[in-house]
Amino acid sequence: DQYIAYGADQCFKMYDLFEDPENHLLHQARGFMDDVNAISQDHWSRGNGWGIIGLADMLQYLPQEDPRWQEAARRMQRHAQALARYQTERGLWRQSIACDLAWEESSGTGLIAYSLGVGIRMGVLAPETFLPVLQKAIQGLADYCLHDDFSTELSCHGCLCPGKGKAKGTLQAYLCDVRA
């Protein structure tokens, strides 16, 4: 039980630190730039996927009467609504989610889609709103990212903030990052 409490506490602290109060997306990192307290400007798709999957896990494994379950549900609803606004026409999310110039990315899309599915199954996300978003993501992954030989397209090649020096972690560094 202490490990469950610790895990939930860490997930909520991550949201408290990285959630953008304006668009409710998560920023990627703190401490990778010259200023160790600076938070990256971007809203990295894989980072948002890892965040919401933590909430999805809590919803699956905590009892519903646990106050942490209710908190995870509230945060998932807010984050899922934010993410749905930025899904592309092809059903994917961009590497830097809120930037129309960023390329579409498969791994963040997969993490987000899985989490939306859990939210729907657990009764936290309204199926009439989020099932079309989930279906569009699955179709986008199938159409644009997965090949018959199981190779993939549009995936991030690393996890560190792109860029060097003062440009590290900036939106420009993300836009210039090479696709893998």
Report the location of each language-model feature.
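Oxyanion-binding "anion nests"
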Residues: 52-97
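Long, well-ordered core segments of solenoidal/helical folds
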Residues: 4-28, 73-91, 133-150
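A structural motif
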Residues: 21-24, 47-55, 84-86, 109
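Non-membrane alpha-helical structural segments and their capping/turn regions in soluble enzymes
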Residues: 4-8, 41-45, 49, 66, ...
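CBM-like carbohydrate-recognition segments
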Residues: 93, 99, 103-104, 110-180
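Active-site-proximal cap/lid insertion segments
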Residues: 22-24, 30-34, 102-106
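Acidic/Ser/Thr-rich, low-complexity mid-to-C-terminal regulatory regions of eukaryotic proteins
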Residues: 26-46
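Well-ordered alpha-helical scaffold segments within catalytic/enzyme domains
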Residues: 1-2, 50-68, 111-125, 180
